[in-house]
Structures are given as structure tokens and as C-alpha cells.
Amino acid sequence: MSWIEKILNKSNITSSRKANIPEGVWTKCDSCGQVLYRAELERNLEVCPKCDHHMRISARRRLETFLDTGSTTELGSELEPKDILKFRDSKKYKDRIAAAQKQTHEKDALVVMKGTLKEMPVVAASFEFAFMGGSMASVVGARFVRAVEQALEDNCPLICFSASGGARMQEALMSLMQMAKTSAALAKMQERGLPYISVMTDPTMGGVSASLAMLGDINVAEPKALIGFAGPRVIEQTVREKLPAGFQRSEFLLEKGAIDMIVRRPEMRDELAELLAKLTQYDLAKDEDELLGEEMIADDIESSDNEPEINIETNKKEDV
């Protein structure tokens, strides 16, 4: 027995109690590997506070944090996917749909809402990448067209946040048809002179990038988002050449003029509100002043309610 074993008698060593930490309190950044407090990450809209890596965010949460609180109404929620072709690969399409719905609590890969953005009426759509890779299918196309129709009816701008791997192969030609369908709908927005802002997030690929994602009056992207038609590996294997560093990332596309601007997610709401206000000649400052004035009036009323009542009769007697 060594001297260290004599000092550290195993019989006297008690096992330390494991810390009782609830699951999901901490998470790790996909980029820098830093351990992050989950609540802090959620407050920062799933953007790493250490390295600014933009993680995936659900479509519903994106829209609820982007639009004014209490102003949202969901559109097209009654539309559900159907396995018309009875498609089957390694798994039945209807089983894939059921699994995706259970995982995401969404009926399909696009969520559409109308509401206000800093009191300005807008319609917004967002892809849910966790639903079969955000793939575009019949319901996605129908909901997007519904969003366009609502924007035309309300005479307001349309915003779409894309996060998709492309067309959904399980719906074959019906999925590819959505490229033409959504593009034709956006042509009506152009005819009416209504702004359409496309926001491309990581990733925006395939048929979505080749249709609705690149047809914005202003094309915006989040930092380091992968945007393109075919993936980098497919292109390298086809052309048999090494691609440039950062190829198909939003910074590369901005440099080449393929997109108009890059906006960080926490700043997206303010930036797009200013853009739309300029495009529609909407007086954003006036609404903000009115809102501030209403808040000040409410504060004055609340403070006056809390002031002690003055008994005039009692004061008169004291003066005498």
C-alpha cells in the first residue's frame, strides 16, 4: 500500500451528493461550446451572448416576439397536410407528418399571423425548421398565399422568415408547384405596391430560396445564415473545385450583392419597423409619442389615485 492510499482510507471517503439541478436549466452553444443559462438565452432570442451565434428558434416564438404583444391573430391554422400520393420511403409519409406534429406541436412547417409591428399593421409568416426541415409542401404554399391575400385585404406589408431545406419530396410535383404558386401571389403584392420583406435565416435552401425567399423588395438575412439552392458539398462534388471560405453564408452573399442587409435577431424588430415605416410613409415616431403619452397619463392617474385625501373641514377648524 502506498503512502497516499494510507492517508486516503477508502472506507472513510463518502460519496458526494449530486447537485439537484432541474433538467434544461443550462445548455451549450453549438458554435463556441460555452455553457449558457437557458433563461438568459431565451431573453436574448436564442442568440449566444458569448459569440453571437444565432441558434434555431421556433416559428411561433419568433412571430410572438417580433409582433406587438396581444395583437396577433393566426391565419390558416385549419389547413392540415394530407398524404394524397400514399408516399412511402423508409417510412410512411403520414407517419412522418404525425411524428413532426408531435415534436413541434404545429400542423405544418409554416406559421402565419397578422398583427401590428410598433402599431403598424402587418402580416408575418415564419418557417418551422423542426417540422421536416421546414420543407415546402401544399399546406405551406396555401398558408403563404393566405398571408398574401390578407396583406392585400388589409393593404399592409408582408414579412416572411425563411428556414427551410427546400421542397418536400414526399409530395413530389405538388410540392414543386408551390414555387410558382407563391411567386404568382407575390406578383400581386408588387402590382399593388405593397412592401414584401424576406428574412432569410439559417438555413434557407432549395425551392424556398429559388422562389419566395429571394423575391423580397428588401432581402434581409441573419448573421452567418446558410443560403443557396444546392448545398456546398453537392457543389464541390459537381464542379470538383474547392469553394471559397464562407461560401453561401450571408456575409458572402452581402459582399456579392445577392442580399441587401444583415440584421442581428435582437435588432430585427426595430430595423424592420423603420424600413417599413419609410416604405409605407408611416409616421412611426408619432405612434411612439402617442403610446408614450398614454403611458404617462396612465401613470399620472395611478399616482393621483394613491395620493391621500385632504379633509378640508378639518383644516379649516385647525386654522381657526
From Swiss-Prot:
PANTHER family: ACETYL-COENZYME A CARBOXYLASE CARBOXYL TRANSFERASE SUBUNIT BETA, CHLOROPLASTIC. This is Acetyl-coenzyme A carboxylase carboxyl transferase subunit beta. Pathway: Lipid metabolism; malonyl-CoA biosynthesis; malonyl-CoA from acetyl-CoA: step 1/1. Pfam families: Carboxyl_trans, Zn_ribbon_ACC. Its EC number is 2.1.3.15. GO terms for biological process: fatty acid biosynthetic process; malonyl-CoA biosynthetic process. Residues 25-294 form the CoA carboxyltransferase N-terminal domain. It is an enzyme of class 2 (transferase). The gene is accD. It comes from Proteus mirabilis (strain HI4320). Acetyl-CoA carboxylase is a heterohexamer composed of biotin carboxyl carrier protein (AccB), biotin carboxylase (AccC) and two subunits each of ACCase subunit alpha (AccA) and ACCase subunit beta (AccD). It comes from the Bacteria. Zn(2+) binds at residues 29, 32, 48, 51. Residues 295-320 are annotated as: Disordered. Its main location: cytoplasm. HAMAP family: AcetylCoA_CT_beta (MF_01395).
